[in-house]
Amino acid sequence: MQKKTIYFICTGNSCRSQMAEGFGKLILGDKWNVYSAGIETHGVNPHAIKAMKEVGIDISHHTSDLINNDILIASDIVVTLCSDADANCPVLPKNVTKEHWGFDDPAGKDWSEFQRVRDEIKAAIETFAHRV
């Protein structure tokens, strides 16, 4: 069976989508190709790397990438993780499902915000895994 593709999109591919890609590969990796990107690139936030390391997931090798049109149109589902990405997501082909899972941006906030958003993203991906 061919793997499906899920593409996590946020504004800068710095925090939320990076954490989603990390959890996605862990939780969905047997059945899904998992990618992330941003409307812009802001570099991977060191606190996102630290937050994921705290739960045993290494995203230190990830890069902050712009949306890749080839991945976008080959995706089965595109998940926007913030209102900016939701509003500015490119038009998708009819065969690509789009979902919006809004999460607060932890950048520039207390460490506990990174942990909270990380845990919310994990829970959302676990819920998604049970429904697909």
From Swiss-Prot:
Disulfide bonds join C10-C82, C82-C89. Its main location: cytoplasm. It catalyses: arsenate + [thioredoxin]-dithiol + H(+) = arsenite + [thioredoxin]-disulfide + H2O. It is found in: Cytoplasm. One of its GO terms (biological process) is response to arsenic-containing substance. It is an enzyme of class 1 (oxidoreductase). GO terms for cellular component: cytoplasm. This is Arsenate reductase 1. It comes from Staphylococcus epidermidis (strain ATCC 35984 / DSM 28319 / BCRC 17069 / CCUG 31568 / BM 3577 / RP62A).
